[in-house]
């Protein structure tokens, strides 16, 4: 190493080569070439010589730096620093220092990259903030403009409101003026009506020229008839001849401006019948006819002037036509003033326009009357509705009763039909009575053996019938009668078996087989001496309709047995008490020699039900 460092200058950097460089491991550092990047970890042979060389180098470097500082040249100083740094060998650094340097270089590169990224990000954020600031400024300007527009609209609305208030005040003033004028006009009209309502003789003496009749006389002074009976009859003949001509009412010239003339057409069926009016106002033509026929009568208060309908004056000419007493009726039915409003007819004829408000009041009264009539009709309808609802409830109850009766009649009919079927089966059973049976001991059962049993059975049944209370159901009584009749039939059958003893003697050899069958038979061991109870009778009635199906089930379940096998006589008596119409062979097929215990149990249950 000392030989290698000889030819180089003391301030220059150099790489030393040892013989052991090839044996050392190579450490890779990024950014640095691999040449001369190895360092021996073995101690040097002459360490003192190396230290001396290093000391000489340091002294030479210090001398050169002092000379440069004395010159004061900054550029030369920097170059010298660089040379000094170059003269420092990386070989002197350990692996940890090299790694630290590499990490620092990496960190510097990473920091520079981050710096660029942050600068770019800051630029973008600055641009976005500037855009947002511009947008906010624009929005602020828009808000200011809108505020100014709203202020202008508010001012315009205030101006319009002030104008509208002025207009309303003017209209209110006009209304108050018009109301005051109307009030003054009404007060004047009321004063005029009060003045005209006062009785005046000049107004009472009316000129009837505008009605095409003569001048009327004073109604209160002259009570005599205005015309004779002949004149009245002539006027009615004219009406009869000219019944379809239009009758016109002539108004004075003063009233032509206020009210137009009205033409009404009427037809008359006869003089004694009422008038059929085709005009919208009822009972107006008889008043006009009275004016023509009786000029001294005051005008009636019908729909012409007052508006109050008088029932007596409406049909006066036709219904109350009597020539002798015409004047008194006129005196009674036509007073000088209206009975409702007490206003003279003269003032009403001259001032019809003034009385129009009164006519409206009268119409209101009429509407109230109609309303009351409608309310009465409504109440009557409600009462009728309640009555109809009551009748409907009664009819529903009757219908329910009838339905119950019909149901009961159907039940009775079904019961009678079952009884009739039962009777027909009894007749079939009587015709197909079974043959005599053999006793279990091998001897033919005689009357001495059967009669006591049957007598006891009959006594038991009779006592049971006596113990049963009398029920209102007629079917139970019929069943009792049937059982009594069947007892007599059983006695006859027993006598018949006693007479046939000689015929059945050759069959004693089959008794042993019968004993075996009887020992394994599922028949019930109930004795015939047991009395019948009311519960048994009711159960017999309930199970009567199911007996045929039970027999079929028993026959289908029981296996085929010997046809010559005979049952026990007590069992035969039990079958007679059940009143079955089937023959003997079909019943006694149930006794078999080859049966399973389950079949025996099922047959026993079914036979118990059957014998009950």
Curated annotation (Swiss-Prot):
InterPro entries hit by this protein: Hinderin (IPR032736)
Domain of life: Eukaryota
A Pfam family it matches: KIAA1328
UniProt-recorded name of the protein: Protein hinderin
Subunit structure: Interacts (via N- and C-terminal domains) with SMC3 (via central hinge region).
Transmembrane segments: none
Keywords: Coiled coil, Phosphoprotein
Residue positions, PTM Phosphoserine: 20, 178, 471, 527, 558
UniProt biased composition (Polar residues): 462-477, 555-568, 575-585
Coiled-coil annotated spans: 90-166, 362-406
Function: Competes with SMC1 for binding to SMC3. May affect the availability of SMC3 to engage in the formation of multimeric protein complexes.
Region Disordered, annotated ranges: 462-484, 509-598
Keyword Aminoacyl-tRNA synthetase tagged: no
Keyword Secreted part of the UniProt annotation: no
């Amino acid at each position: 190493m000392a030989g290698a460092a000889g030819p180089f200058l003391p301030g220059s950097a150099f790489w030393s080569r040892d013989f052991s460089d090839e044996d050392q491991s190579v450490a890779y550092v990024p950014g640095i070439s691999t040449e001369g990047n190895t360092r021996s970890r073995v101690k040097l042979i002459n360490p003192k010589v190396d230290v001396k060389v290093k000391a000489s180098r340091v002294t030479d470097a210090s001398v050169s730096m002092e000379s440069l500082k004395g010159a004061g040249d900054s550029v030369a100083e920097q170059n010298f620093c660089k040379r000094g740094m170059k003269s420092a060998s990386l070989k002197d650094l350990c692996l940890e220092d090299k790694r630290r340097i590499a990490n620092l270089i990496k960190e510097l590169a990473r920091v520079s990259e981050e710096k660029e990224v942050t600068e770019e990000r800051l630029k973008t954020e600055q641009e976005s903030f500037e855009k947002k600031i511009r947008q906010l400024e624009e929005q602020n300007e828009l808000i200011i403009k809108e505020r100014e527009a709203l202020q202008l609209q508010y001012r315009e609305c205030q101006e319009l409101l002030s104008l509208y208030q002025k207009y309303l005040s003017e209209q209110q003033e006009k209304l108050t003026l018009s109301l005051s004028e109307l009030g003054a006009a009404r007060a004047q009209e009321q004063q005029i009506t009060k003045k005209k309502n006062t009785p005046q003789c000049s107004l009472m003496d009316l000129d009837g020229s505008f009605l095409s009749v003569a001048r009327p006389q004073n109604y209160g002074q002259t009570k005599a008839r205005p015309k004779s009976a002949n004149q009245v009859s002539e006027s009615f003949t004219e009406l009869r001849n000219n019944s379809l001509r239009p009758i016109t009412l002539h108004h004075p010239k003063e009233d032509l401006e206020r009210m137009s003339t009205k033409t009404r057409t009427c037809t008359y069926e006869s003089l004694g019948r009422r008038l059929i009016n085709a005009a919208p106002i009822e009972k107006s033509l008889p008043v006009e006819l009275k004016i023509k026929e009786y000029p001294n009568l005051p005008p009636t208060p019908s729909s012409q002037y007052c508006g109050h309908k008088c029932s007596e004056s409406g049909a006066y000419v036709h219904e109350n036509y009597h020539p002798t007493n015409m004047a008194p009726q006129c005196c009674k039915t036509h007073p000088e003033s209206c009975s409702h409003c007490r206003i003279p007819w003269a003032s009403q004829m001259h001032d019809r326009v003034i009385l129009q408000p009164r006519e409206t009041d009268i119409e209101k009264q009429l509407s109230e009357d109609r309303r009351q009539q409608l309310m009465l009709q409504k109440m009557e309808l409600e009462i009728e509705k309640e009555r109809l609802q009551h009748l409907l409830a009664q009819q529903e109850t009757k219908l329910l009763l009838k339905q119950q009766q019909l149901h009961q009649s159907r039940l009775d009919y079904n019961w009678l039909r079952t009884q009739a079927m039962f009777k027909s089966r009894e007749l079939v059973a009587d015709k197909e009575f079974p043959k005599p049976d053999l006793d279990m001991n091998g001897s033919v059962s005689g009357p001495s053996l059967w009669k006591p049993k049957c007598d006891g059975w009959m006594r038991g049944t009779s006592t049971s019938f006596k113990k049963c209370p009398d029920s209102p159901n007629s079917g139970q009584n019929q069943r009792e009668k049937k059982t009594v009749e069947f007892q007599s039939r059983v006695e006859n059958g027993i006598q018949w078996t006693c007479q046939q003893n000689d015929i059945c003697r050759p069959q004693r050899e089959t008794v042993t087989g019968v004993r075996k069958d009887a020992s394994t038979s599922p028949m019930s061991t109930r004795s015939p001496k047991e009395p019948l109870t009311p519960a048994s009778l009711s159960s017999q009635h309930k199970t009567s309709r199911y007996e045929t199906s039970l027999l079929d089930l028993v026959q289908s379940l029981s296996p085929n047995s010997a046809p010559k096998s005979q049952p026990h006589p007590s069992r035969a008596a039990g079958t007679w008490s059940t009143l079955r119409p089937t023959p003997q062979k079909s019943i006694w097929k149930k006794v078999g020699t080859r049966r399973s215990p389950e079949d025996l149990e099922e047959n026993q249950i079914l036979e118990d039900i059957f014998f009950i």
